[in-house]
Amino acid sequence: MKTRTLNGAWTLEIPGTPFAAVPATVPGSVYHDLLAAERIPDPFYRDNEMEALKLMDNDFVYFRSFQVDDALLAGDKVLLRAEGLDTIAAVHINGQIVGEACNMHRIWEFDVKSVLHPGENTITVSFRSPTKYIKEAYAKSVADGSSDAMVGFPNIRKAHCMFGWDWGPRLPDAGIWRNISIISIEKARIQDVRVDQVHKDGTVRLRIHTNLNRYTDDEVWVNVSVTAPDGSVLTASGTDCELIVQNPQLWWPAGFGGQPLYQLSVSLCAKGKELDVWSRRIGLRTMTVSRRKDQWGESFSHCVNGVDIFAMGADYIPEDNLLPRVNPERTRRLLEDAKAANMNCIRVWGGGYYPDDFFYDICDELGLLVWQDFMFACAVYNLTDAFEENITAEFVDNVRRLRHHASLALWCGNNEMEQFVAQGEWVTSMRQKADYIKMYEYIIPKVLKAEDPQAFYWPASPSSGGSFDDPQDPTRGDVHYWMVWHGLLPFTDYRNHQFRYVSEFGFQSFPCMETIESFTAPEDRNVFSYVMEKHQRNASANGRILFYLSQMYLYPRSLELLVYASQLLQAQAMQYGVEHWRRHRGCCMGAVVWQLNDCWPVASWASIDYFGRWKALHYYEKRFFAPVLISCHEEGILSQNTNVNAEPFGLKKSAHLNVSNETMQKFRGKAKWSLRRPDASVIEEGSFDVTVPALSAVWLPEQDFSNYGTYDTYYSYQLLDEAGNGVGDGSVLFCAPKHFRFADPELNAFVKDDDIIVTAKGYARSVEIQAGADVVLSDNYFDMDGGVKAVKILRGSVDSVSVRSVWDIR
């Protein structure tokens, strides 16, 4: 098979506007090309989004010329292959229309042999205005959805969040966003390859099914090889063949074992000539979701190689509103940062797009389980015959593209639609409710049965199994829990719920000052300014951050301190939830934080901001997602929902340590504890011997401190392994930090080689090392009982360093 790439230099025109034609790059997009040509300002700066949005009321034309030789035209089939057209497009070659597209999530192929000729040819791809299209389509066929997005967004198969979301701007870009090429096929080609695995008696039987597109009656044959990580090779032949792998090296999620990958190659040959080749890496593993009746209801947990895994991870959204900016290097850093925070699971949220192949390749390498939503979110759809045909082709394209990946843990029908459709949200007819059932409980399962029969399918998130059967049932399936944040309940409310698997819960914070400065002018730097609220898409959420801040901290004297306090709020909210659910391992088997990343600079739920900068939450995640975690369920003012005006009160003050072990080995060690004063001097101290079986959690004896002060004592704890090495530590207060009688810890910090050395003379809570926004450290936002702590510089260069703690929030 010969390929003539059409990637590279094109020209972009915007008919009917004063814009002159500009050079364009494919893969690319309208915004990306206009920015490169300096024809529009940065849409992420201040409120430039509004002008950029108006631009999308236009149509757009991409064109170029290209050379074709006789060898390319000699093929038995010559196709134009477009792997991503965003979205409503018509394609002309040499002035003749060859095809139309209506779905950015699909691969489009058009027969072009009859319109090509030797020498110079021209291609034009015309895109309709996405904003006008959804307006016209909505007028003809009402399909409603989230009010954070533009009206009509469900009427187009385009990443929903491009039209706005409660964390993203309204920037519905357009263009040729993935590879485009001419392919010339001799005799036949490989259409797709499916690999099924049967694990039995210490061997893995690989069943390899190859589908061909044949264009002649000539004899062809298929050769298959599997190369193991050690270089050994197994071979077979035929469109349906089997290989038996002896002593297989199994693929495991991060934290449970290695991620060995086998190279599977399928070649199509005729008369000694290779016509086509399909080559991918696969991992040998079993993968499903355990659903068993138990004392709490019905379990829900990823089961890999027979082991039930506690999912520790985050929800992934598109990395950029300008899709051409997403590349393997950027995605690798983001996913490596997820793994660095001890995550083992990533949920690909259903309101964006199906990520590029490299996303899944990296997850395979890192051991990150992928919960894969189909691209439907917070909307209803009208299932016409044309729409059904369109989405079915979308499902087939993407299932075939992704199914071989070791990291693919499950397919999920949609985001949050079962619960909202069940409530009648967005539904304007009973037909739409019936269409919901047909789409997610008939069409998708039918496609998966044919294309990925070994995969686990879940109809929606959240769901209890489908058919509108109590989608948020806490005793089965997965839940999205938002009463903390959207419901304004306190952090401690998480402890009232055990759940089986929490696939969304979150809390917002502001990004760091350097990120805020990237999208604001000096006069904008107030959290209630127009620009700051334009970069806060969750309605009045800046005020919500301050509402929660009022419960926990003194009012900060500067925006910089407010940003710091907001990040602590976010981190501590998630800590309350995750630590609680890990303490109840077995009942709860998943804590997936909303969200991992941002698509533009914004105040949001992300733990890593648009520029890849770690917030406090990401450092906290590194601790509370640790394979072996020591945590403390404290009782005090916050947990008992009281306040200072209830004094004098009978207040329980206690500490109850727990060690959770998400490893395959028994853990033995020692838990050391101490009750201390604000200057970190010890009032009482002691220790517990700790033994925790693999894949379990153990409570240590509860300790009562009701006779000690509420505002001037704190509890500190540390876990050591048998060799005396520190495994984890922390501290808890018996009151809100705003009322604790902190003493100045007299923090100091300096750089020594690749370390930052922090010293404290007293209790320092949530110590933040400021060493540059792009610097990543081995630890940050940690507690100190006085003394000295050395922190490694993992990424970036440090010119100067400063340090602060909760004592400084005033």
Task: Map each language-model feature to its residues.
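Active-site mouth of glycoside hydrolases
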Residues: 105-106, 126, 160, 170, ...
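Substrate-binding clefts and catalytic carboxylate motifs of secreted carbohydrate-active enzymes
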Residues: 14-15, 172-175, 411, 446-449, ...
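Flexible loop residues that form catalytic
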Residues: 128, 185, 351, 416, ...
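Glycine- and acidic
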Residues: 249, 342-346, 555-563
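Secreted/periplasmic carbohydrate-active enzymes, especially glycoside hydrolases
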Residues: 1-345, 475, 583-584, 613, ...
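Flexible loop/turn segments at secondary-structure boundaries
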Residues: 87-89, 132-134, 290, 318-321, ...
